[in-house]
């Protein structure tokens, strides 16, 4: 992401429905599958809200390839920070029990190498918690603006993760309730030749609260069951 996107992330991630719901789901999956006091690595940590919210569960390390992102992390009181690329993580082999990668894999040119690096730094039986955009047909100017390389089909993500040495515990679509609306908006935008810009903007307190309530209801479903389609994919896997 460019500097402007990190600035927007820092301003919005504690309030905007998308960031809050995604982060709460990721943290919940860590609580469900990772013992307390584990060493947790948040890769592609962005402005640091996820790492901050993971801190009560274990010893959290945060890594990003942007120094600007790490500056925002410091403002959130985070100190175990590393500047690094997901394809060449600056961590020892077998040094953490959990890796969290929320909407990161799509930013990496070589996703196979990134998953191998995640497997390398995890201890045996270590846990990966991951989210990533779903359905190539939803590709839009939003993806271009955020420097995505791809969106994933569930079968493709499963194959990639398993070939990297993981056993999949959970693999589900997410943002299920809003999928029809997002799909229509993306397809119409493509037909109209919409320009490349991130589709994240403040929508007002009322709509934001409503969307967050919907996503929290959906997150409760995801604790127990997989969903058949959605804008994103979420995964839990063990090395």
Language-model-detected regions and their locations in the chain:
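A short glycine-rich, Lys/Arg-flanked "PGG" loop and its adjoining helix->strand segment in the class I
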Residues: 112-127
């Amino acid at each position: 992401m460019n500097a402007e996107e990190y600035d927007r992330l820092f301003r919005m991630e504690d309030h905007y429905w998308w960031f809050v719901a995604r982060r709460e789901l990721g943290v919940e999956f860590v609580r469900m599958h990772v013992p307390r006091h584990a060493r947790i690595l948040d890769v592609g940590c962005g402005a640091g809200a996820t790492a901050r919210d993971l801190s009560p569960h274990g010893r959290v390390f945060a890594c990003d390839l942007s120094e600007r992102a790490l500056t925002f992390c410091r403002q959130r009181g985070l100190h175990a920070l590393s500047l690094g690329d997901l394809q060449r993580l600056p961590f020892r082999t077998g040094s953490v029990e959990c890796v969290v990668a929320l909407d990161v894999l799509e930013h990496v040119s070589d996703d196979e190498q990134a998953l191998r690096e995640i497997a390398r730094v995890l201890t045996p039986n270590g846990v990966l918690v991951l989210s990533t955009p779903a359905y190539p047909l939803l590709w839009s100017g939003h993806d271009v603006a955020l420097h995505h390389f791809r969106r994933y089909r569930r079968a493709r993500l499963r194959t990639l993760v398993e070939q990297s040495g993981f056993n999949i515990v959970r693999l589900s679509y997410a943002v299920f309730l809003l999928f029809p609306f997002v799909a229509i908006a993306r397809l119409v935008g493509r037909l109209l030749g919409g320009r490349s810009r991130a589709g994240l903007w403040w929508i007002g307190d009322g709509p934001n609260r409503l969307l967050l309530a919907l996503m929290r209801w959906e997150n409760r479903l995801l604790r127990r069951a997989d969903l058949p389609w959605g804008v994103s994919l979420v995964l839990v896997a063990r090395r």
